Every structure is written in C-alpha cells, then in structure tokens.
Design a protein with these regions (language model features):
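Helix-turn-helix
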Residues: 15, 23-57, 61
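Short coil/turn segments at alpha/beta junctions that flank glycine-rich nucleotide-binding fingerprints
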Residues: 26-30, 81, 103
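Amphipathic alpha-helical packing segments from all-alpha helical-bundle domains
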Residues: 68-79, 83, 98, 119-147, ...
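Amphipathic alpha-helical segments used for helix-helix packing
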Residues: 100-121, 170-174
Length: 202
C-alpha cells in the first residue's frame, strides 16, 4: 500500500479514491484519463503522480485497496455458517451496500477490473485479482445448491439472480434520488420473489 498517501486527511484520500474509481470504472484502464481524474478530484496532476508515480501505479493501488476494502466488509457481514443461498446473497449485498455508502463506484470498478484486457494493467493486478476471485468464490461455495435440484437448474437460477442484481444496480444508480439503502431494499424484494419462484419450501 502507499504510506505517503495515507498520511493525507481522510476526506482528501476519499476524494482522490472516488474520482479514480469513477473514471477507471467507465471504460477500463486504456480509456481512463488522469486529466479527468484530477479534475474530478479537484487536485493537480503533480500531486497525483507524487503519490502514485504513474497511471499504472494508481491503478494497481486502487485495485489492491478496493479488493481489501470489499473483502473486509464481506467478512463482517457474511456468516460463515450460512448455507441458505438467498440469505447468503442478501448478506453479500448488504456488505456491498455498506461499501457503496463510502465508495459509490468501488464495486463497478472491481467488476470492470477483473475483466480488464490491457496487458500492463492485467499484469499489475494479477496476483491480487486471483486472491480476490478465490475469496469471492469461497463465499459462494458456502451455499447449499441442492435445494434447487428438484425444481430448477441451479446454474440458471444463480445467473438469473446475478442478472437481476446487476440490472437493478444499473437502473437505480442513474436515478436522481438514488441511495444504497433503496437499492438494497429493492434487491431483497426481488430475491424474495425469486426464492418463491425457484424453491418449494417445506
């Protein structure tokens, strides 16, 4: 991590992080402009490079910070004993909602970054990306997917859930009255509906 950067006041750190997350999440590494980042953050380009050295240095820091922050929040919200797929999904979305309150573009940045194709960027985050994806997979593997077997295909159901959450996030984040809490409430309502459609409760 970057000790010099963390000596800054928290407000300035968050301003620079949020600006960088926003710009990198729009079109990936190749299309992100440091000019746009410094304009969004309200700082000089010299200051940005003082702390991160280069665009690639900033990108590497940002992925490391975001993955650590997201995984920490997931560890707080997700119960290790939880095996109910829909309850587990709600806990994971609760964690993402908490992250979104402070860093609105962090989840989107991570989603874009794991699909990044720019060679230098891919190499820079390769090790951290592997760890991040392994940790996310471990949470997903807690769920008991056998509950879907008599009534539906678990792969299709989980894809349907993911598409629903992603679609709601894209739709609601564009609204003028958007809030992470409203998004989470809507996601939970849809998850409850999908549960009734896919599981026959005993």
């Amino acid at each position: 991590m970057n000790d010099k950067f963390f000596d800054l006041k928290q407000e300035k750190q968050d301003r620079m992080i949020n600006a960088s997350l926003k710009i990198f999440s729009r079109g990936g590494y190749r299309h992100a402009s440091t000019d746009e980042i410094v304009k969004e953050a309200g700082i000089s380009k010299g200051l940005l490079f003082h702390y991160f050295g280069s665009k690639l240095g900033l990108y590497g820091f940002l992925f490391d910070y975001s993955a650590r922050f997201m995984l920490l929040e997931l560890s707080r919200e997700v119960k290790r004993s939880e095996t109910d797929y829909f309850a587990l999904t709600k806990q994971m979305e609760q964690a993402r909602m908490q992250v979104m309150k402070l860093y609105p573009y962090m989840q989107r940045f991570l989603d874009v970054a794991v699909k990044e194709e720019h060679t230098e960027a891919v190499e820079r985050i390769a090790e951290k990306k592997l760890d991040y994806e392994d940790r996310l997979r471990a949470y997903s593997m807690q769920a008991d997917y056998s509950i879907f077997a008599p009534y539906g295909d678990s792969v299709r159901v989980t894809k349907m859930v993911r598409y629903t959450i992603d679609g709601l996030t894209d739709e609601m984040s564009e609204r003028y009255d958007f809030s992470p809490e409203k998004l989470f409430a809507e996601i939970c309502a849809y998850l409850d509906t999908l549960r009734r459609m896919t599981i026959k409760e005993t």
